[in-house]
Amino acid sequence: MSGDLSRCLGKGSCPPGPVPEGVIRIYSMRFCPYSHRARLVLKAKGIRHEVININLKSKPDWYYTKHPFGQIPVLENSQCQLVYESVIACEYLDDVYPGRKLFPYDPYERARQKMLLELFCKVPPLSKECLIALRCGRDCTDLKVALRQELCNMEEILEYQNTTFFGGDCISMIDYLVWPWFERLDVYGLADCVNHTPMLRLWIASMKQDPAVCALHTDKSVFLGFLNLYFQNNPCAFDFGLCNPIIR
């Protein structure tokens, strides 16, 4: 079964075979924050799965039969049913598979987590814009001010709730949905954006103790190697750090 560290499939590759019974497949990419969301949920719930990594700079033609725009992540089950868009995919996994529910059962609490996610919605694009500006040698002062403000808004939520996690006293879906961008702050050169948010820093430290987060952590040197190649438009970026394909 292909694992998280399997090499990417690119243009000219053969499509994978049918998804085995009792397994769900995720089309992913090791460094993608949106795929990271779904991989965290798969890991947290202990769902048996296989990973097919996709080369996003040289996408296989067959992949457009999985997603009309060739985006990731996509889930596929043994009935050939496809689920895409990261939040939808995560909710599907939580609804379909047994184990601890990551979204609350209570309708209001579930709605509240989705509202928190809406408050977070500016962080991903701002993080990306800051990264691009820094990599291209452009001034990103205004972008970082805007990002800090959004992170201060998240800080205020934790202060108001007086809880360690965004969903309460234990990790829940909202924490996994926002985590990928916080894991990337240091790699992107944006770690100072949480210098004045003590509750957020406590949350980050607590998240780093979670087994699913630990299992999917990518070493900073590997991430930086990926970014260096990615910004050179090198299609080998997506396999950076893999000496040989790893099958598990």
Swiss-Prot record:
PROSITE patterns: GST_CTER, GST_NTER. Keywords: Oxidoreductase, Transferase. One of its GO terms (biological process) is xenobiotic metabolic process. The active site is at C32. Pfam families: GST_N_2. It comes from the Eukaryota. Exhibits glutathione-dependent thiol transferase activity. Has high dehydroascorbate reductase activity and may contribute to the recycling of ascorbic acid. Participates in the biotransformation of inorganic arsenic and reduces monomethylarsonic acid (MMA). This is Glutathione S-transferase omega-2.
